[in-house]
């Protein structure tokens, strides 16, 4: 009998090797397909072939607009600065703090002054290797900077000890994506530069910077904050509030302003995430930090800081508008309560909660529907003013610091000749804008809002509508003092539709009264619409409305039907005495 064991062993080895190679080929094929673009780039492999036919027409569909890369880069740099100069929003300007006088000598404070937020995270990041800084931008406009203070903030010792703590742009670890800290330098760390401040006392410019974006969400605890990561060395976990060190900085600058060292205090909001702005209103925060001017500059892009220099110097008059509603306390926004992460029920089963993979095992639930941002704050405001059922206790003035669309100017503008005409598929809004100031030329951003009818059908079918919605905007040319311009904004009727998810399963356009208004921001838009409905909103009237509504709610709580309470008390004079204080 022949010995067959060697053949059996050989076939076993070959079978095992074949199985391994098969698995490797399958896995390799999947990986290769998934990363085909990266592999082709690394190997310089071409994935296409150009075959020229008989027709040799021009196939260069996208023509070069520049003679050289240098020309293109110069254009892009100028464009970025222009976008910033046209988009930054002036929030506050008292005592003629802005623009800075020609030749002004100023001191720059805050770690953000030497380490600006140029862009966001992930795909929003910016190459800063060629980006100018705030000092260069101001010097280009003839402003002199306190070099001693600048050198101190820029020193290796300060940068290593008091730099922002931000997570990696993209990380697979949930913990790594929530490691945020402002880490501002304490006032004591600036003592070596204190003797230089008086010489550069035309203004103290404070830069408040915050990061956050794609792949690096802000801390999200039970209430939209993190207990594990701090806003400052001794913060409370609220990354979008001022840290203890930032408050200390403002307090000391106020003291220096009071003793005459500084003429003005100017704050730059260098963040695309909405920082709480209670510190700009002494009545809200309970302390006066002596801030004369504040400007939201967002993330400035590669060369946008040059636009900020133009704004601060008065070379350009601010004409930008806020794209968010800024609050005194972000926890007043109900959407904050949806800003948290929780694990999928089967996340542990698939090892999605282990270190290095835990961001894949989390999710957030959104419940706010259309009531996000100004659609919530302005709709609830109108409900309170009109005494709508279930409006609850709500005071817009102590909640909202600056509404959506807000943006001040160095000059003033007036609107006139407002008119709306209708065509088959659109409404055309026209008005006249006049620069009523006497000193500065500038542009004005005209915003058009609408309100659609809130019908019984809408209520029956769960269709929600906001008190006002932005439907168009336009910016004037630069208007000299006394000059005017006619502005035309076209609104397509299709943009007024609402989605009916429960019944029609499509977009609908309700019959009824539609209100259009041109306004400087979302809040003024709602007030214009309320005035058109017959509500005159003086301060006294607002107090009356709030008092009447409070009395109605109290009456309902004590057993009176809402309809009876509304019929019984319509004015302040009709209220019980305890509500008339």
Segments the model singles out, each with a brief description of its role:
Residues 1-581:
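C-terminal non-catalytic regions of proteins with extracellular/luminal or membrane-system context
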């Amino acid at each position: 009998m022949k010995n067959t064991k060697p053949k059996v062993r050989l076939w076993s080895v070959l079978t095992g090797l074949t199985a391994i190679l098969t698995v490797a080929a399958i896995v390799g094929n999947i990986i290769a397909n998934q990363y085909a673009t990266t592999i082709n780039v690394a190997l310089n492999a071409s994935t296409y072939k150009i075959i020229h036919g008989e027709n040799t027409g021009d196939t260069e569909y996208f023509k070069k607009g520049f003679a050289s890369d240098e020309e293109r880069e110069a254009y892009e740099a100028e464009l970025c600065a222009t976008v910033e100069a046209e988009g930054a929003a002036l929030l506050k300007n008292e005592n003629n703090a802005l623009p800075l006088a020609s030749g002004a000598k100023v001191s720059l404070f805050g770690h953000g002054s030497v380490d600006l937020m140029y862009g966001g995270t992930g795909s929003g990041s910016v190459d800063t290797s060629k980006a100018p800084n705030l000092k260069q931008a101001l010097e280009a406009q003839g402003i002199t900077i306190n070099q001693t203070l600048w050198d101190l903030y820029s020193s290796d010792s300060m940068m290593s000890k008091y730099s922002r703590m931000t997570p990696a742009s993209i990380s697979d670890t949930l913990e790594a994506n929530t490691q945020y800290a402002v880490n501002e330098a304490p006032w004591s760390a600036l003592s070596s530069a204190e003797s230089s401040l008086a010489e550069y006392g035309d203004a103290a410019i404070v830069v408040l910077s915050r990061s956050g974006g794609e792949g690096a969400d802000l801390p999200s605890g039970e209430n939209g904050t993190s207990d594990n990561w701090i806003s400052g060395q001794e913060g409370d976990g609220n990354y979008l509030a001022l840290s203890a060190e930032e408050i200390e900085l403002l307090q000391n600058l106020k003291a220096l302003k009071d003793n005459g060292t500084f003429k003005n205090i100017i704050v730059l909001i260098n963040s695309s995430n909405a920082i709480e702005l209670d510190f700009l209103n002494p009545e809200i925060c309970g302390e006066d930090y002596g801030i004369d001017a504040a400007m939201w500059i967002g993330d400035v892009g590669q060369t946008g800081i040059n636009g900020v220099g133009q704004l601060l110097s008065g070379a350009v008059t601010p004409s930008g508008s806020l794209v968010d509603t800024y609050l005194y306390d972000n926890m007043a926004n109900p959407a904050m309560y949806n800003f948290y992460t929780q694990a999928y029920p089967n996340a542990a089963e698939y090892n999605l909660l282990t270190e290095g993979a835990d961001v894949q095992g989390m999710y957030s639930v959104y419940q706010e529907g259309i009531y996000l941002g100004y659609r919530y704050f302005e709709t609830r405001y109108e409900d309170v003013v009109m005494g709508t059922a279930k409006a609850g206790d709500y005071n817009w003035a102590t909640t909202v610091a600056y509404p959506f669309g807000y943006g001040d100017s160095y000059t003033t503008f007036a609107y006139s000749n407002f008119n709306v005409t209708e065509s088959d598929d659109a409404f055309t809004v026209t008005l006249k804008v006049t620069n009523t100031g006497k000193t500065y030329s500038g542009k004005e951003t005209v915003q058009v809002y609408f309100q659609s009818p809130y019908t019984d059908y809408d209520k029956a079918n769960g269709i929600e509508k906001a008190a006002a919605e932005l439907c168009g905007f336009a910016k004037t040319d630069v208007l000299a003092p006394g000059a005017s311009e006619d502005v035309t904004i076209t609104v397509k009727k299709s943009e007024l539709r609402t989605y009916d998810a429960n019944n029609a399963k499509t977009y609908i356009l309700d019959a009824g009264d539609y209100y259009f208004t041109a306004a400087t921001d979302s809040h003024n838009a709602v007030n214009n619409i309320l005035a058109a409905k017959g509500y005159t909103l003086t301060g006294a009237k607002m107090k009356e409305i709030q008092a009447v509504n409070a009395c109605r709610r109290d009456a309902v709580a004590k057993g009176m039907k809402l309809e009876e309470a509304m019929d019984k008390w319509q004015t302040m004079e009709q209220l019980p005495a305890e509500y008339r204080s």
